[in-house]
Amino acid sequence: MSIPKQIDALRLRQIIEFCLRRELAPDHPLPRMEEDLVESGALDSMAWVGVIGCVEAAANVPDLGARLADSPASIAALLAALESPARARPKQPQKTTRKPAAAGPPVHTDGQAVILGWGEALGSQVIPADQVESEFGLTPGKLRDRAGIESVRRVTGPENEFNLAAVATRAALKRARAKPADLDFLIVTSETSLGYPSLGAQLHSRLLARDTCGVLDVGGACLGLLNGFAVARSLIAAGSARKVLVVSADVHTRQLAPGRVPGEFGGLFGDGASAFILAASSPSPASYRLGEFIFGCAGAYAGAIRVGPAGGGRVDLHFDGEALSRAAVSRLERIIADLETRSRVNRDDVGAFATHQPNPRLVELLARRMDVPIEKFPTVARICGNLGSSTCGVALNQALTVQAALPAAARLPIFLASLGPGLLWGGGVIHPSSPERPPR
């Protein structure tokens, strides 16, 4: 006699509760059905993987992880996956040799890496500049009047680099109409995520990406996203990957907090993340492709900013703001001029400049010196603060969204330019796949 459906469903709930109890803290109540257990902090990503493995074994559903894909880490998602029509049967012995999960025909891309999807995530709190000034003991109006900061985005509760990265990634996957199982490589950058496993490994675990999907965490601080793009493009051009996820995520406000650093420095920063799906696809009228990239390091400015741990929970900070501001404007201007030469795209024909934005005043100065409208610089630092490696990413998200809404023939190139402590620098061009315009 078959088991009634309601009893079967009850048994599944009992299995889920049993597996959750193994991973939750002893005094933790049973979570709500829709609660994302990783984002709420009830479980870390490795514990969630443990829950999935336990349920797979107890319910005899060996492909549960694949079914969940990018679903939330919730009881409701587990039940939906378990009760789906494609209920797995016990594994049967394989008589044929399976090919590796990543096996497939060689990738022929002519060096092309196309952006299929993009996403962003910001700290959920919007903190006005006057509140930040008060917290740091700054003179009223200092951040707004001298730096141009109107507000900063700040994480709260369980939010962290990992959560922000996951939210941005889900948005990018959705836009790209892709699944975690499609990814061949994850490239992640963060200047604030410390410890092990690395942020890339945690994100791989959260996405339930396949075990043949590589992970690489890259550095460069505020230049990290461009470093990630360069690596992704190389992997795709070499035929080593078809789809690559590039993610940036930084939470500054917990480390650069009042009492740890001066407000003139710490008050400039916010929290955010960005994500991009790059693919070895043939360019279509709706897509953008990675073009020319340049990198370097102005080592003469290596001592202009130094950040490290100090006693008593404080941060050891050396920050020559005046020298860095002069160097930043000059270097960003040179990067853009060099990109013009290499790409044969005039700055007047650029749709947006997704640059690093240490502060809004510096962006305004750069726009004046370049003689381009300030409107071509997406608004990030003014309302979010300096997002570190995600500043360029959030700016590029905005630029791509605006350009994607235009007819294909009206879309314009996007210039990237960023700086990192050291003084690391880099730039790149994102080309639309619409018919090329003759250079001026």
Protein language model annotation of sequence segments:
Residues 2-103:
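Phosphopantetheine-dependent thiolation modules in NRPS/PKS and related acyl-activating systems
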Residues 100-158, 260-326, 330, 334, ...:
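Condensing-enzyme catalytic core mediating Claisen C-C bond formation in acyl metabolism
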Residues 136-144, 195-209, 246-255, 307-310, ...:
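Acidic-glycine-rich active-site phosphate/pyrophosphate-binding loop
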Residues 162, 166, 192-193, 210-212, ...:
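Claisen-condensing/thiolase-fold acyl-transfer catalytic domains that form or cleave C-C bonds
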Residues 237-270:
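Flexible, glycine-rich active-site loops centered on histidine and acidic residues
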